Every structure is written in structure tokens, then in C-alpha cells.
UniProtKB/Swiss-Prot annotation:
Organism of derivation: Schizosaccharomyces pombe (strain 972 / ATCC 24843) (Fission yeast)
UniProt name for this protein: Uncharacterized protein slp1
GO cellular component: cytoplasm; endoplasmic reticulum membrane; membrane
Glycan-linked positions: N94, N111, N128, N142, N393, N415, N495, N504
GO biological process: protein folding in endoplasmic reticulum
Keywords of the record: Endoplasmic reticulum, Glycoprotein, Membrane, Signal, Transmembrane, Transmembrane helix
Stated family: Belongs to the SLP1 family.
Region: Disordered, residue numbers: 417-445, 580-603, 632-659
Cellular compartment(s): Endoplasmic reticulum membrane
Cytoplasmic face of the membrane: 575-659
Subunit details: Interacts with EMP65.
One Pfam family recorded for the sequence: Sad1_UNC
InterPro entries from the UniProt entry: Suco/Slp1-like, SUN_dom
Transmembrane residue ranges: 557-574
Length: 659
């Protein structure tokens, strides 16, 4: 049993070795390969694509035949649809797409084979799946493969892809880096700073709900990627960049096999994170190639200084389940870089203007004055040469961006015939752009590359400083005129001051004479009257003081008399009281009981209550010894009647004493 298994294993290993020798050969060993088109990978190169060397093997085999006169075509179909050629694509000036293969080849082949036959023979998937190549109408171009020694440098072997005769092309040019592991990258983008990297604190702000691992696209690790379902309706990613930049290049890559590659996508930017989707500013819609390499997309008009970048994936190649994105890079210019470039251009223009002015001074042409209209005052500047090849402004007053204040809003230049034309001060036309036959001149300013783009803060500050300098110059001119006028009137002011001084001295002399003759005698008389009045005032004050003292004495005497009168009145009233007032309980030894009246108020209340509410028999009275004696004298008289009589006597005696 073991022997059978070992023999089967040996047979399988032998079959595998034979197939490997037949199919996995290199271009250098293609002279003994029976099927060079089946070569999968070259051991001498580090290319990740598995079909490039197969194409090279076909080219090398055909190059050995050296059939330049007879066009040769090849029929080749890749063994795997995911094994795609690694091409470096860029847009040339004439509009044709140039593909440069990054591989090592020691063969040179050149014949009259048309480009359509070459593309159809060696790369059917690229032609069929890419919308940028028209299979019906193609221009015939020759191709060549040249020898390159260093494998780390992109070779000069290239193939010019055909374009349609009507000039149609893609909406954006895609630059594909076939070997991102190598040091040399197309357009030297690798040397630039990536503003969508986690090294500078860039972050993924938002993605569609189906996206997984979105932060992986900001790292350089090829094994990590943002995974997205191709069936998702709205696939997007929002990234916060490191700084506010002018976005000029976006690079996207998908290195994953057995997955669909993005095709059409839209790039939008915003300075602040927008609340609404309509706030995003679209930079363009781009079409990528069906290649698993780093693809570059250049943006012509960045519009604004972007802090947030949004990429929406619209379509994709193939019909796989997942549409991953492995890497994203964003390149651009910061505000300070834009300002430095503008400053360099300004310095170059300043040097050119200075040389032009020096050359014009030698010619000594006819001069004509220039007038500047202001809101309130017309200011005439120095004459300027009429030659249109000379700039209007000198090197001392030339600014990086011509921004004149409201007071210097219009420039009017006269000519020999008396005609004049007015132009705003923000005109971007210079003297160098006008032919010598022109009859008018224009002010100079820099021409911006993108006039609709948002200006940087440094450029805005520079413009404000330029405006401030212009206003200061205008202010200095006005102050100089004012000082000139002041100098003219200064002599008149001095004469007027001297006249006032002489008049003042004359008036002082006249006033002193008048005071000596008139004012002093009157002053003496007034002083005598004042002394007399002060003496009379002192006499009146002494009289008033004596009267006050007398009145206070009389007041005290009156109070004393009133007091004595009151005392006498009280005494007389007390002395007139009757002496025989009846008293009750006089025999009592208690003085308090003796001083009590015959009956108290409580007893009166009781008697009144008995009169009105109770019968006479139930009345209670206090009976003294006198009442008992009277009762004995007159038994028919009741105690009540006797008591009433006594009360009448008491009341009568009291009223009499008071009277």
C-alpha cells in the first residue's frame, strides 16, 4: 500500500515537473520552450503581472523571424482574465495614448504591423473593456521594443495606442504606474507629499454603509484595502486632508485579484465639511483603466482650497462581487507654495520689466502724460514713454497683483491725435502683448492660471498690502500738496501774526492810560462807599442781636405767667367743692372703704338691670346706717326711693361745686 502511494506521488511529481518546464519558461529560455505563449512569469523581473512576459515571449519569438516585409499577427488569449498587462499610460500633446511596458527585454522588433492588429492580438481584454479605444476606427502606428539595462527604471519601449479619427477620447487622462514598489514613478509623483496619508493626520470621515476597512486606503500597505460590494448603489468615501490645498492629482489603485476594478468615478471637494450634498464642488468625472496598478488622474481646475475630498464610484469593470480600493493618494499645492510660485513669477516679471525700461530709455521716444482720475481730486503723474513695448509701471511700483484702490479706479492715457481710452486698473493686458501700431496703452498685471479659482490667504494678504501701499502713495502725494500750499501761506500767516502782536501792544498802552485817568478816581469813591455801607451793616446787626435777646426774655416771662395762671385756676376749682358730701361706711376703720361713694358703678349696673329685667323684690342694694334711720322714720318709703333721692342730691352738689 505504501509503495503504491509512493509510486503515485512520484508519477504526479514527474508530470508536474514536465508541465512546469513546458509552461513556466522565461523570455531568456524561449528558444527551447515549445509553447512560449503559456509563460506565466519571468524569474528575472519583479513584475507582479503574470501575463506581461507571455506577451514579451510572443514578441521575442516573432522578432527572431525578422520578417519586416510581411506583417505578422498573433492569436493569443490570456489564461486568466485577472492577469492583465502592466502598462504605463499617459496623454501626449497630440492627444494619442502612449503605453510603455515596464519589463526587461533584449530584443528589438519593428515591422509594419498595424496597431489595431497588435492590440487585438496580444490584449483582447484591454481593448474590449476600455472605453477609450475604438475597435472600429484605429490609426496605424509602428511600435518598437528597445533594450534597457536597469530594471528599476521605466523602459523606453512603448506602443502608441490608436484613437478614433474623430478625435474622441476619455474625459480624463489616466497615468498608470506599473511598478509602485520601484523608486522611479511616472511624473515623479512619489517625491511629492501625499496629503491623504495617515502620516499627516488625514482621516476618513464618512463612507457608504457597505464599506469595510475604509482607513486602509490611506496607508501604503498593499495587503489592506477598503472592501465594498459592487452591488451597492451609492459607493463613496469622504476624506479629510492634512491641509487646505489645490488638488491637482489623485491616484487610486486596486491590487486585489478576483475583484472588479473601478471604472468611472467622480471627485468633489469642499473647504468646509458641507451639511448638504449640493454643497460639494465637482472637479470632474474620470475614467480609469482596467489595470491593477496605481492610476493617476490630473485635475486642470482645482476651483477652491480643499480640505475635504469626496470620491464617488459610479461604475466598475467585470462582474465580481467585491469592488475594493487598495490605495488613495492626493497631491496638490498649499497656500504657501502657491504664494512662493506667484512671488517667483513676480520677481521674474519685475526683472524683465526693468530690462525693458532700460532698453527703452536709450531709444528716447516721444513722451505723453498720463492722468489718473480720482473721486475728489485729479492727480497728474510723471510722463510715460509712448512706446507700447515698455511697461506702464516702473520696477519700483510694480506689484505682484495689480489691485488699485477706489481713488485710483481709472487710467487714461493720451496720444498724439488727442484720442484717449479708459481702462479699469485691474486690466490684465500688458504693453508686451500689444503691437507697435496700437494707439493706446494698458496697465500691467499678472495673468492668473485659473481665474475662477479661490485665492490663497497669502495672496489675498499680498494684494491687501499692495492696495495699502498704493493708498499710502496717494496719501503721500496729497500730503505733499498740502505741505506745499502750507508753505505758500506760511509767510502770510507770519505777517498776520506780527500785525496782531502790534495791535495788542497798542491796545495795552491805551488801556493803561484810560485806567490812570478815569478808572482810578472812580475806584476810590466806590471803596469809600463800601466802607460806609459796611459800618451801617455792623450797626444793624448789633440792633438785631439786642432785639433777639429781649424777645427771648419776654417769651420766658410769658411762659411763667401762663404757668401761674393755670395753678391758680386749679386751686380755685378745688377750694370751691362742698364740704358736706355724703359718705358711706364712715364708721369703718379702713380709709379705702371710707373714701368709696355710697355705691359703686357695679352696683349701679346691677340696679339698672334690676329695673329693666328683674322685679323690684329681687333688687340688691347696699344699705347704710343713714338709710336704715330714714326707713325707720318713714316706713312707707321704699329703700329704692330713698336711694334715688340720695343719688339726686349727690349729683346736684357736684354740679353746683363745678359751677
Amino acid at each position: 500500500m505504501v509503495k503504491r502511494r509512493l509510486s503515485a506521488f512520484g508519477n504526479a511529481f514527474l508530470i508536474y515537473f514536465i508541465i512546469f518546464r513546458l509552461c513556466c519558461c522565461s523570455p531568456q529560455t524561449s528558444h527551447w520552450c515549445k509553447y512560449p505563449a503559456l509563460c506565466l512569469k519571468s524569474p528575472d523581473t519583479h513584475n507582479e503581472n503574470l501575463v506581461c512576459d507571455a506577451y514579451l515571449s510572443v514578441i521575442a519569438t516573432k522578432s527572431e523571424e525578422k520578417e519586416a516585409s510581411n506583417p505578422t499577427t498573433w492569436d493569443f488569449t490570456p489564461t486568466n482574465k485577472y492577469q492583465e498587462p502592466s502598462f504605463h499610460t499617459k496623454t501626449s500633446l497630440n492627444g494619442s495614448d502612449t503605453i510603455s511596458s515596464n519589463f526587461l527585454s533584449k530584443y528589438e522588433y519593428s515591422n509594419g504591423t498595424s496597431t489595431s492588429e497588435f492590440i487585438d492580438s496580444i490584449s483582447p481584454p484591454l481593448v474590449n473593456e476600455t472605453s477609450t479605444i475604438s475597435s472600429s476606427k484605429k490609426l496605424e502606428q509602428n511600435y518598437s521594443v528597445t533594450e534597457v539595462i536597469d530594471t528599476n527604471i521605466i523602459t523606453s519601449s512603448s506602443v502608441t495606442l490608436p484613437i478614433s479619427e474623430d478625435g474622441s477620447s476619455t474625459s480624463a487622462a489616466a497615468t498608470i504606474d506599473s511598478n509602485i514598489d520601484e523608486k522611479t514613478v511616472a511624473f515623479s509623483e512619489e517625491k511629492r507629499f501625499n496629503f491623504a496619508s495617515t502620516d499627516c493626520a488625514a482621516a476618513v470621515i464618512k463612507t457608504n454603509p457597505e464599506a469595510v476597512g475604509s482607513s486602509s486606503i490611506l496607508t501604503e500597505n498593499k495587503d489592506k484595502y477598503m472592501l465594498n460590494k459592487c452591488s451597492a448603489e451609492n459607493k463613496f468615501v469622504v476624506i479629510e486632508l492634512c491641509e487646505d490645498i489645490y488638488v491637482d492629482t489623485v491616484q487610486i489603485a486596486n491590487f486585489e485579484f478576483f475583484s472588479s476594478i473601478f471604472r468611472d468615478f467622480k471627485v468633489s471637494v469642499s473647504g468646509k465639511y458641507p451639511k448638504y450634498e449640493s454643497s460639494w464642488m465637482e472637479l470632474g468625472t474620470f475614467t480609469a483603466l482596467n489595470l491593477r496598478t496605481l492610476q493617476s488622474f490630473h485635475i486642470e481646475n482645482p476651483l477652491i482650497w480643499a480640505k475635504y475630498l469626496k470620491i464617488e464610484f459610479l461604475t466598475h469593470y467585470g462582474s465580481e462581487f467585491y469592488c475594493p480600493v487598495s490605495l488613495l493618494r492626493v497631491y496638490g499645492k498649499t497656500m504657501i507654495e502657491e504664494f512662493e510660485e506667484a512671488n517667483e513669477d513676480f520677481l521674474e516679471q519685475k526683472v524683465n520689466d526693468g530690462s525693458a525700461i532700460k532698453a527703452d530709455e536709450i531709444r528716447k521716444p516721444q513722451e505723453s502724460p498720463i492722468f489718473v482720475d480720482e473721486e475728489d481730486t485729479d492727480v497728474q503723474s510723471k510722463p510715460v514713454r509712448k512706446n507700447p513695448s515698455v511697461e506702464l509701471n516702473s520696477t519700483d511700483t510694480l506689484l505682484s497683483s495689480t489691485v488699485i484702490s477706489k481713488s485710483l479706479s481709472t487710467v487714461v492715457i493720451g496720444n498724439e491725435t488727442g484720442k484717449s481710452e479708459s481702462y479699469p486698473a485691474t486690466s490684465t493686458r500688458s504693453f508686451n502683448d500689444i503691437s507697435p501700431s496700437s494707439s493706446s496703452s494698458y496697465s500691467t498685471a499678472q495673468i492668473s492660471t485659473f481665474p475662477s479659482n479661490q485665492e490663497s490667504i497669502y495672496k489675498n494678504i499680498n494684494k491687501r498690502l499692495s492696495t495699502l501701499e498704493e493708498r499710502k502713495k496717494a496719501f503721500d502725494e496729497i500730503v505733499e500738496k498740502i505741505l506745499t500750499n502750507y508753505g505758500k501761506h506760511n509767510a502770510k500767516n507770519m505777517n498776520f501774526t506780527q500785525l496782531l502782536h502790534e495791535l495788542n501792544s497798542t491796545l495795552q498802552l491805551e488801556i493803561s492810560k484810560l485806567s490812570k485817568s478815569v478808572v482810578k478816581p472812580s475806584l476810590f469813591a466806590l471803596q469809600a462807599k463800601l466802607e460806609l455801607l459796611s459800618a451801617e451793616n455792623e450797626y444793624f446787626q448789633s440792633q438785631i442781636t439786642s432785639l433777639y435777646q429781649e424777645s427771648s426774655f419776654q417769651k420766658r416771662l410769658l411762659m411763667l405767667q401762663l404757668t401761674v395762671l393755670i395753678v391758680l385756676t386749679v386751686y380755685m376749682a378745688v377750694s370751691r367743692l362742698p364740704e358736706n358730701l355724703p359718705t358711706t361706711r364712715s364708721s369703718s376703720n379702713n380709709p379705702i372703704e371710707a373714701s368709696r361713694p355710697p355705691f359703686s358703678r357695679d352696683e349701679q349696673d346691677i340696679s339698672k338691670a334690676n329695673d329693666f329685667r328683674v322685679s323690684a323684690s329681687s333688687a340688691v342694694y347696699t344699705v347704710g346706717p343713714e338709710l336704715l334711720q330714714r326707713k325707720k322714720r318713714d316706713p312707707n318709703t321704699s329703700i329704692r326711693s330713698i336711694h334715688e333721692r340720695e343719688q339726686d342730691k349727690i349729683i346736684h352738689s357736684r354740679s353746683h361745686s363745678v359751677c
